[in-house]
Design a protein with these regions (language model features):
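Cleavable N-terminal export/targeting peptides
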Residues: 1-34
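Transmembrane beta-barrel domains of Gram-negative outer membranes and organellar outer membranes
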Residues: 22-160, 165-171, 175-191, 213, ...
Length: 295
C-alpha cells in the first residue's frame, strides 16, 4: 500500500465521525471519568483498558519509514515512501473483565514477515476511589510467522521445526490515574522466542512505562518506553535499542485515533521489544497511526 492510499484512508476514517457528531447531543455521550487509558493500546504496547462486554473493535495500524537519518529525509518523503509495517486486527470483549484479539501484520522483514498474532487479556483489579488505588491486567499473547523458509541455515528465518516460528509474551500491566487528566503505567514483560541466532537470547525481560496526559475533552498526549534487560555480550547496545514512542490521541464515542512517532518498526510485543534497532538521536524514528473502531 503506497503513501497516498494509506494517507487518504486514514483521513477518511478520521473525518467521518465529525459529520456523525453534528447530529449527536454531546451530553448523551456516555463517557466515564476519570479514564486511565482510553484505548486498549498505548503506542506500541497494551494499555490497562479493555473492551466492554459484547463489544468488537477493529484496529488498523500503519508504521512508515525513518523520518530522517540515512534512510530518511526529503528524498524518501521523510519515510512516507516506505511502509515499515501494517497490522489489521479484530478484538472482542467477552465480558467486562476478559477480552481477546487476533491480528495479521506484514512484518518488517527484520527478521520476519507474514505474522499472525493473538492475545488474551484479563482485568484483575480496577481503580476505585476509596477502595482500590490502582488497576491491573494480565496479558498473554503469541505470534507465528508463516513466511517462506530461508535456504541458509545461518538465517534466523531458517526454521528446522514449525514450533520455531512461534514467539510468546506475558505481561502485568499496572496503571493509576491521578485525577482526571494524568495517568501512569508500569508494564513488566517476559518474552520468549523459540528460535534465535547464536548471538541472541531466547528469553528477554522488559520493563515498560507510559503516561497519558489529557489536554482536552477529545485529545491526549501519550508517551511509552520499554527498557530491555539483556546480556550485552550477546545483544550489544550499539545495535539493539529500547523502544520509545510519543503520540497524540484523538478519541470520540466509538472511534480512537492515534498519530505517533517511534523508533520501532515492528508492530506487536514479539516484534518491537526484541527487534528495535533504530536510534532517535540519529533521526531514525518514523511516523505511524492507528485507527480503532468499536461496534
Amino acid at each position: 500500500m503506497n503513501f497516498s492510499l494509506s494517507f487518504f484512508t486514514f483521513l477518511f476514517l478520521a473525518v467521518s465521525p465529525l459529520f456523525l457528531a453534528q447530529t449527536t447531543d454531546e451530553s448523551e455521550i456516555p463517557f466515564e471519568e476519570p479514564i486511565t487509558f482510553s484505548s486498549t493500546r498505548i503506542i506500541n504496547g497494551h494499555s490497562i483498558a479493555s473492551l466492554p462486554k459484547g463489544t468488537y473493535e477493529m484496529r488498523i495500524e500503519h508504521r512508515f519509514g525513518d523520518f530522517s537519518g540515512t534512510n530518511g529525509g526529503y528524498q524518501n518523503m521523510f519515510g512516507f515512501d516506505y511502509l515499515s509495517d501494517m497490522r489489521i486486527a479484530i478484538e472482542y470483549g467477552v465480558n467486562d473483565k476478559f477480552m481477546l484479539g487476533f491480528g495479521r501484520s506484514k512484518g518488517t522483514g527484520a527478521p520476519y514477515r507474514s505474522l499472525l498474532d493473538g492475545f488474551l487479556k484479563y482485568k484483575v483489579l480496577e481503580q476505585k476511589k476509596g477502595s482500590m488505588p490502582l488497576s491491573m491486567t494480565v496479558i498473554s499473547g503469541s505470534s507465528f510467522t508463516y513466511m517462506k523458509n530461508s535456504i541458509l541455515q545461518s538465517d534466523v528465518s531458517f526454521f528446522p521445526k514449525a514450533s520455531h516460528r512461534l514467539a510468546y509474551f506475558t505481561q502485568l500491566n499496572l496503571a493509576k490515574h491521578f485525577g482526571e487528566r494524568f495517568s501512569l503505567a508500569l508494564i513488566p514483560t517476559l518474552l520468549h522466542r523459540n528460535y534465535v541466532t547464536q548471538n541472541d537470547q531466547n528469553t528477554l525481560f522488559a520493563l515498560g512505562s507510559a503516561f497519558r496526559l489529557k489536554i482536552s475533552s477529545r485529545f491526549a498526549i501519550l508517551a511509552e518506553y520499554y527498557h530491555v534487560f539483556h546480556n550485552k555480550q550477546f545483544r550489544p547496545s550499539s545495535f539493539y535499542k529500547n523502544s520509545l514512542g510519543l503520540a497524540l490521541e484523538w478519541f470520540t464515542f466509538g472511534h480512537n485515533f492515534t498519530v505517533n512517532f517511534t523508533n520501532s518498526g515492528g508492530l506487536g510485543e514479539t516484534q518491537f521489544i526484541p527487534y528495535t534497532t533504530e536510534n532517535w538521536l540519529k533521526g531514525q524514528f518514523r511516523f505511524g497511526f492507528c485507527v480503532a473502531r468499536k461496534f
